[in-house]
Design a protein with these regions (language model features):
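Active-site nucleophile and cofactor-binding loops and adjacent substrate-binding regions
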Residues: 14, 39-45, 64-67, 92-99, ...
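Serine residues within intrinsically disordered or low-complexity segments
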Residues: 220-223
Length: 223
């Protein structure tokens, strides 16, 4: 469990470095058992949003957690402007603050200098899986999987690509977004304590729970 902060009514934030530190400690603990590990995987709460600097590797704002409702007025305005059906048709999602798109936009619009840095190509976005992959591969790989991408409200579930029209609607540079791989893709190698363990599975927590029900003894993931 991680400590959440509630700076204002309806706001929910998380220090993503706490997550990274816990994951590193967990990996070190597992490695201390001298197990023969062929590969590892990552599962996560899907919509929680992190924006960080490519040049420093540090988050420019605390992670905005999936429960956060700070963008509800903006979402309501988009509904009044008639964008809800387009978003639903492209993403399969309702227009709601729950998802990542409006969280990213809020950070770009409210963190000093963020939009300029994004336009310059210095800012990266990811859900928790993407941030962990980036940090645990030594800032090498900026990837996510389809289950996490599908919860951003920016991913077209028919083309399986980031949607240009939605990126324009939310005013988010495509350069911020990770490359989308299948859940069993090659996400790079885990670099902790001089190990080189392949990361060969990334999936959202709710999707993983379905697999876990059918094969409960076979799964061990970073969560």
């Amino acid at each position: 469990e991680y400590d959440l902060s509630y700076p204002k009514d309806g706001w929910v934030e998380l220090n993503v470095e706490d997550v990274l530190r816990t994951v590193r400690e967990t990996v070190k603990s597992v490695l201390s058992n001298n197990l023969e590990i062929e590969a590892c995987g990552i599962t996560n709460q899907r919509e929680t949003t992190v924006v960080w600097s490519k040049s420093t590797g540090e988050a420019i704002y605390p992670a905005i957690v999936w429960q956060d409702r700070r963008t509800h007025k903006y979402c309501n305005n988009l509904k009044l402007e008639g964008h809800e059906e387009t978003i639903r048709n492209k993403t399969g999602l309702v227009l709601d603050p729950y998802f990542s798109a409006t969280k990213i936009k809020w950070i770009l619009d409210n963190v000093n200098g963020a939009r300029d840095k994004a336009e310059e190509g210095d800012l990266l976005f990811g859900t928790i899986d993407t941030f962990l992959i980036y940090k645990l591969t030594g800032h090498q790989n900026h990837f996510t999987d389809v289950t996490n991408a599908s919860r951003t409200m920016l991913f077209n579930i028919h083309t399986l690509e980031w949607d240009k029209e939605l990126l324009q609607l939310f005013d988010i540079p495509k350069s911020m977004l990770p490359e989308v791989l299948s859940c069993d893709g090659n996400f790079g190698n885990l670099n902790v304590n001089n190990t080189n363990i392949p990361i060969r599975g990334v999936i959202g927590d709710q999707q993983l729970s379905l697999i876990h029900i059918s094969e409960p003894t076979r799964l061990s993931t970073l969560s």
